[in-house]
Each structure stands twice: as structure tokens, then as C-alpha cells.
């Protein structure tokens, strides 16, 4: 009983420090501090630390590499170029631009992770719609769409979200196996997200805008040579992802190698300050992931994940549909309350403790990922990316209160989550009946 109380106390204390970040305390320090406390208290041992490090090292380093690549692309104007093309392609129609910007966000989230989409694309979209002289009421839908779509469409590939990488690594799921299960739910989520966003904001989206106010996409490019090279880098990255499975190469090695090549090339570019790019990379995530997982392992050692295993087992016993929907909403609710990274870790441990196999086990694993990817949009504390996204927006004069965020988030997230989980359920039935 004492170890259980200690494990819960250390977990909650670490979580509060991570979310609150008093005096700008790094999330890495908070999580590692919690891990040290867990070691001192005896709720984990050094063998647990080694086990955890073995689980998360690939995930975190791959994530850092993807963000490094996206930061270089941002520096050379790649994402602004893409956003301006969307605005031009919409030909002055507001709703069309709203949809196109959402589609761009979905592509960026899929290839460059949700954090890259939310933190890089949102300021570009904000600057673009302000340049079109939209008032704040008309700007709001585009900003929320950029942030919302970044998480709801970060499903299709292992590298699209740190949550995905952590879960795939824990259950030893390869890049192709993961994509084969999640690309279809991703399409469900994308379609549902755009429909829900449009229905919610339809009265606030301008019918028309002045196309002459949109600058030429080519003007956004700050280095033509690096811009041309970036297409080869992206092609190499995609080939590397798929090839990694056949050669049993960790995704982090593929992404990391390409990030290093891109960084070396960027040193010659006047548009990219490589030292600044390296400094801006989310290195704290490495220490946060290891430290937080150690703390979560303490909760597991205390037997609390067994309780969650029983709840998940009860849902699974009701059949595939109930198991899929139940697991997804459990993950979403927990993510919205205590952040999605600890949630996906705890849920993975709990799923491993259930008596499930085959299609049911797959449904639980992928529903957990979906819930942990989408659930954070319900509350501002659901993900670190959302907290940082709100902070970036406030610095650019776009303040969104937690109340406004929650009211908007819960209305948008619940139907999107349900539709995506139904998509997963249908796709798993098709896969297992046809192949």
C-alpha cells in the first residue's frame, strides 16, 4: 500500500511540474526529477530504467530528427511556399481556402509530426490571413483548424506523432505494418475533422478574399538551392522509412542520418542558422520521455495498471466494436486529464496485461493511439504541443482562453474521435476478412 501511495504521489507531482513548468522549468528536468524520486523511493529499480530506455530511445531521437528537418524547411520558406500555393489554388473562395489549409496541415502532420504542423504552420497561416486583412473573428477559424488538424491527422505513420512511435516500439510494430492499419483511419479522421470544423465555423469563414493580396509563393523561398535539395531530402526520407523495415534499421537512424545530411548542407545557406536550428530542437523531449516513462513504470510496479487492464478487458469482452470504441475513449479522456504521453505509456502497459489476442489486441493498440492523438484536443493540458501552441499564439497577439479552448475542443473532438474509431473498426474487419 505504501509503495502504491508513493508511486501515485510521484506521478502526480511530476505531471503537475511538467504541465505547470514553474519558472520555465524544463519538462526534461521535471520528468528526470520524478524518475530520481521513484528510484529513491524504491518504486522502480535500475533494471526498470534500462528497460524504459530501451523502449523510448528510438521514439524520442526519431522525433527530434523529424523536428530538425522541419525547422530547416521552415527556415528556407518551404511551408510558407506551400501555404501560399493553397491560398492561390482556392482562387479567392474562403471556404475553399479553409479546406485547403486543413489539407496542408494534415500532410505536414503526417510527414513532419503534429508538433511541426502546429508550431510551424500555424504562425504562417496566421500571418497569411492577417495579410488578407481578416478581422480577428475571421482569423480564429483558420488558427483553430491549423492546431486541431495537426493532432487529429497525426495518425498515418509511426513518425507522425511521438505517441505513435512510443506505442509502435513497445509492441514491436514495423513502419509498414503500422501504416497498413492506420492510413484508412487517418482518412476517416481527416474527412471528419474538415466536416466538423466547417460545420462549427461556417458562419465565421469569409465567403471571398482578395486574391491580389496573396503574395507569390516563389517570394517565400529564401534559398532556391536548399529548396530544390529539400525535395530530394523528403524523397529520401520516405524511401528510408519503408526500407527501414526490410533492413531492420530503427526509424531514428533513418531520420537522424537524413537530418544530419540536411544540416551539413544547410551550413552553406544564408537562410539557415544551423546552430540556432540545433538549439531549437526539442532535446528536452529525450529526457522527458525516459524520465516520465520511469515514473509511469513505478505506477505499473505498484499494481495500478492492473486496474486499468481490468477495465480494458471488460470492454474487450463485449466484442470488437465495444473494445475499439471503449479503448479509444479511455485513452482520450486520460489524455485530456493527464497529458497524452503518460497516457499512451500507461495504456500500453495495461493492454499488455489483458488476455487479448489477434484482431482484438490490434484494435486495442491502435485505438489507444487514436485516443491519445485526438484526446489532447479536448483540453489545453492534453499535450505539450498544445500548451506551446497557445504560448506562441499569445506572443503573436492571438489570445485563446482555456475556457474558449475547452468549449471548442470538446465539441470538435468527440464526433471526430468517434468517426475515426469506427473507421478503425471497419478497416480491421476488412483486413482480417480479406487477407
Swiss-Prot record:
Q: What's the superkingdom here?
A: Bacteria
Q: Name one GO molecular function term.
A: arsenite transmembrane transporter activity
Membrane spanning stretches? 1-21, 26-46, 52-72, 92-113, 117-134, 139-159, 181-201, 225-245, 246-266, 277-297, 319-339, 410-430
User: One Gene Ontology cellular component annotation?
Assistant: plasma membrane
Q: Which UniProt keywords apply?
A: Arsenical resistance, Cell membrane, Membrane, Transmembrane, Transmembrane helix
Write out the annotated subcellular location. Cell membrane
InterPro entries recorded: Arsenical_pump_ArsB
User: What membrane topology is annotated for this entry?
Assistant: Multi-pass membrane protein
For the biological process aspect of GO, one term held by this record is: response to arsenic-containing substance
Major location (coarse): membrane
> Which family, according to the similarity comment?
Belongs to the ArsB family.
Which NCBIfam families does the protein's record reference? 2a45, PRK15445.1
Listed name of the protein: Putative arsenical pump membrane protein YdfA
Q: Supply the gene name.
A: ydfA
Amino acid at each position: 500500500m505504501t509503495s502504491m501511495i508513493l508511486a501515485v504521489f510521484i506521478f502526480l507531482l511530476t505531471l503537475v511540474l511538467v504541465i505547470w513548468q514553474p519558472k520555465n522549468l524544463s519538462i526534461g528536468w521535471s520528468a528526470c526529477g520524478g524518475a530520481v524520486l521513484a528510484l529513491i523511493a524504491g518504486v522502480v529499480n535500475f533494471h526498470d530504467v534500462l528497460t524504459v530506455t530501451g523502449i523510448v530511445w528510438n521514439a524520442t531521437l526519431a522525433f527530434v530528427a523529424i523536428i530538425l528537418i522541419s525547422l530547416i524547411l521552415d527556415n528556407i520558406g518551404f511551408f510558407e511556399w506551400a501555404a501560399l500555393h493553397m491560398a492561390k489554388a482556392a482562387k479567392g473562395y474562403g471556404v475553399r481556402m479553409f479546406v485547403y489549409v486543413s489539407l496542408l496541415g494534415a500532410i505536414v502532420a503526417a510527414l513532419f509530426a503534429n508538433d511541426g504542423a502546429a508550431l510551424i504552420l500555424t504562425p504562417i497561416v496566421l500571418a497569411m490571413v492577417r495579410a488578407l486583412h481578416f478581422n480577428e473573428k475571421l482569423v480564429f477559424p483558420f488558427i483553430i483548424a491549423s492546431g486541431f488538424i495537426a493532432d487529429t491527422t497525426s495518425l498515418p505513420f509511426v513518425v507522425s506523432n511521438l505517441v505513435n512511435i512510443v506505442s509502435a516500439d513497445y509492441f514491436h510494430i514495423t513502419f509498414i505494418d503500422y501504416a497498413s492499419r492506420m492510413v484508412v483511419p487517418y482518412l476517416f479522421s481527416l474527412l471528419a475533422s474538415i466536416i466538423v470544423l466547417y460545420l462549427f465555423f461556417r458562419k465565421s469563414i469569409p465567403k471571398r478574399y482578395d486574391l491580389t493580396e496573396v503574395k507569390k509563393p516563389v517570394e517565400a523561398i529564401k534559398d532556391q538551392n536548399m529548396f530544390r535539395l529539400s525535395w530530394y531530402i523528403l524523397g529520401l526520407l520516405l524511401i528510408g522509412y519503408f526500407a527501414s523495415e526490410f533492413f531492420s534499421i530503427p526509424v531514428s537512424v533513418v531520420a537522424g542520418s537524413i537530418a544530419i545530411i540536411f544540416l551539413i548542407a544547410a551550413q552553406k545557406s544564408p537562410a539557415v542558422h544551423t546552430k540556432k536550428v540545433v538549439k531549437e530542437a526539442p532535446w528536452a523531449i529525450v529526457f522527458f520521455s525516459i524520465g516520465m516513462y520511469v515514473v509511469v513504470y513505478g505506477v505499473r510496479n505498484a499494481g495500478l495498471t492492473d486496474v486499468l487492464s481490468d477495465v480494458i478487458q471488460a470492454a474487450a469482452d463485449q466484442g470488437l466494436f465495444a473494445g475499439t470504441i471503449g479503448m479509444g475513449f479511455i485513452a482520450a479522456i486520460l489524455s485530456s486529464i493527464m497529458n497524452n504521453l503518460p497516457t499512451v505509456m500507461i495504456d500500453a502497459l495495461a493492454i499488455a496485461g489483458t488476455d487479448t489476442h489477434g484482431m482484438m489486441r490490434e484494435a486495442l493498440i491502435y485505438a489507444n493511439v487514436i485516443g491519445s492523438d485526438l484526446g489532447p484536443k479536448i483540453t489545453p493540458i492534453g499535450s505539450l504541443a498544445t500548451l506551446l501552441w497557445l504560448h506562441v499564439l499569445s506572443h503573436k497577439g492571438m489570445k485563446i482562453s482555456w475556457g474558449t479552448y475547452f468549449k471548442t475542443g470538446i465539441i470538435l473532438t468527440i464526433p471526430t474521435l468517434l468517426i475515426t474509431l469506427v473507421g478503425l473498426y471497419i478497416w480491421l474487419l476488412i483486413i482480417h476478412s480479406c487477407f
